[in-house]
Amino acid sequence: MVAYKNIALLALTFTIASVESLSIVGARPYIDKALSVFDIKTPNSQSEKPEIILTFAGPDDKPVPGDSPIVQCEASVPQLLNLQSVVIDPNPPLRGENLTFVAKGVLSQDIEDGAYVEVDVRYGFIKLLHQTFDLCEEITKIDLECPISKGQQVIEKKVEIPAEVPPGKYIVSARAYTKDDIFITCLSAMVEFPPL
């Protein structure tokens, strides 16, 4: 499904709007710095390459073709999106540089208004975000809109990785569902940025 291809893209860029509402007493400056990895408004600068960690949480996870850090979780469960590839450039992502995603897949059913996605963002062991989003509202950020027609989908998006990304391991997972709670897809990505 394109909507979840958006989640492949949104798995790293999707939390932009919702992350702004996160507030933890006394930890806000630290959280803001960690969350800045998802902010696309930061200026460019030189940086070190992060390490992509291709470890899979469970026996039911499988890598998505394209040599990216994205894996399909719950792969044995029927999903409406057959994600064929996700290519990122540069690979691995670099601080202070633009990152281009190209995702390709086949959606087996139209996705209509009311679809939603559950997103978790972690910084190491710290859960920064657990929130449910309106999928159709979020995909407008990557120039798509509902209904999304079944069939072949290709999504390309360019985002900026802030130069101020704090070092550490970032884990993003997203599970998308139709308005009738039919499983669209589950994607997860893990990227580790080295110390500056």
Curated annotation (Swiss-Prot):
GO terms for biological process: intracellular sterol transport. InterPro entries: Ig_E-set, ML_dom, ML_PG-PI_TP, NPC2-like. GO terms for molecular function: phosphatidylcholine binding; phosphatidylinositol binding; phosphatidylserine binding; sterol binding. The keyword Signal applies. GO terms for cellular component: fungal-type vacuole lumen. SMART domains: ML. Residues 22-60 form a propeptide. Monomer. Belongs to the NPC2 family. This is Phosphatidylglycerol/phosphatidylinositol transfer protein. It comes from Debaryomyces hansenii (strain ATCC 36239 / CBS 767 / BCRC 21394 / JCM 1990 / NBRC 0083 / IGC 2968). The gene is NPC2.
